[in-house]
């Protein structure tokens, strides 16, 4: 599943490619991709004739703000891709479910083999304070709060390490309200938005913490180390345009793979030597997912 760095890479590319462009037509080949709407016709009517004013992101969600104040929200799910093509004559990949055509030419295509992702148009509430925010994100500063109020469907999302501002000690206070394993908490989208199985492993390795350490057991030094690892890992992955694994399901807006997979320290490196201590990286199954870590460097 694309995580925050992959979605942020798409956001940056979309901001350059589609802002200021008017939507000429929308076609929907699979209604499951727009399942929040009563029909594909309803979804199309909300988009056709509208102009994209800006592109944002919160957690794993892309947000295309339209000229009437509505927002086209895109979640890629497990296998979704957004592809920008200059010519409508370019062959469409298999599993192309939604196509947005612009008046100035070219298309934006949503491709999703497993159809767990979705697109929907959100209308801002009449009252800006009508939807309660997540207990975690509600205490944060930055741009995230404004996004949650404009798109109430995302009000449940927790702290976004890029869009929200939060001190490390406040982050530590929130961690200490939970006794479960730290990896599961980082992946809980109501606690931290945008982190998934891959980057949680990388962050915990950088912080020297085991995946199953109780969150409320972290010392102040460990909290600070984890906070720094979260911010630095995400920034580095964004700089390298995200991670594409062996299946190469993640592609950027132009169909190119990411580059950060070459910098993975533990993820998908079972049996390979740890780059710090040279002991082998271990893989265990937790909650139906694979977790990769170093038994010697992470405590």
What are these regions (language model features)?
Residues 1-125:
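Surface-exposed binding/hinge segments that line
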Residues 72-194, 199-206, 214:
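Phosphate/anion-contacting hairpin/loop surfaces
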Residues 22-43, 169-299:
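Basic, nucleic-acid-binding surfaces and adjacent catalytic neighborhoods in DNA/RNA-processing proteins
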Residues 1-4, 90, 161, 165, ...:
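Generic detection of long, well-ordered alpha-helical segments
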